Amino acid sequence: MFGMGFFEILVVLVVAIIFLGPEKFPQAVVDVVKFFRAVKKTLNDAKDTLDKEINIEEIKKETLEYQKLFEDKIEGLKGVRIEELEDAKIVAEKEIKSVQDLMQDYKQSLENNAPPKHLNKEVSNREVFHNEPPKEIELIANNNTTKHDKEKEHV
């Protein structure tokens, strides 16, 4: 204890008995033991508080890590949505170009009094077997209906 050997502790006890006397010595020992217990309790409380603070810091670090992970996932989802919109835009542009080509073909056929080129294409077996109209004809039919509706609005 405190770097003292058994002989040194014995010398301190003998000096304490001589200095304090046999009546005060037991009370002094009790007071010293209470003091060391209080110091030990205070140190343990400080240690527990420090452990709790360290635990709180670890929880804060974990929370920040989860928050960063969550934000990264949100950014990833935003990127997916933008990519999906760009893909949809490309598909829509292709469809618009296809419709414009069909309209151009239709206009040329009206000018030349010939059937449109897209009507000369063969219809697939699937469309005939399932009684489905060809897809390109559906687009023209929908387009004509839209034009007819627009003409009604102007009248």
Curated annotation (Swiss-Prot):
Any one GO MF annotation of this record: protein transmembrane transporter activity
S-S bonds: none
Keyword check for Membrane: yes
Cellular localization per UniProt: Cell inner membrane
InterPro entries, per the entry: TatB
Basic and acidic residues composition-biased segments: 119-138, 146-155
Main subcellular location: membrane
Membrane topology listed for this record: Single-pass membrane protein
Entry GO CC: TAT protein transport complex
GO biological process: protein transport by the Tat complex
Domain of life: Bacteria
Keyword Magnesium annotated: no
Entry keyword set: Cell inner membrane, Cell membrane, Membrane, Protein transport, Translocation, Transmembrane, Transmembrane helix, Transport
Region: Disordered, residue numbers: 109-155
The family this protein is said to belong to: Belongs to the TatB family.
Biological function: Part of the twin-arginine translocation (Tat) system that transports large folded proteins containing a characteristic twin-arginine motif in their signal peptide across membranes. Together with TatC, TatB is part of a receptor directly interacting with Tat signal peptides. TatB may form an oligomeric binding site that transiently accommodates folded Tat precursor proteins before their translocation.
Subunit structure: The Tat system comprises two distinct complexes: a TatABC complex, containing multiple copies of TatA, TatB and TatC subunits, and a separate TatA complex, containing only TatA subunits. Substrates initially bind to the TatABC complex, which probably triggers association of the separate TatA complex to form the active translocon.
UniProt-recorded name of the protein: Sec-independent protein translocase protein TatB
Organism: Helicobacter acinonychis (strain Sheeba)
Organism lineage string: Bacteria, Pseudomonadati, Campylobacterota, Epsilonproteobacteria, Campylobacterales
Gene from which this protein is expressed: tatB
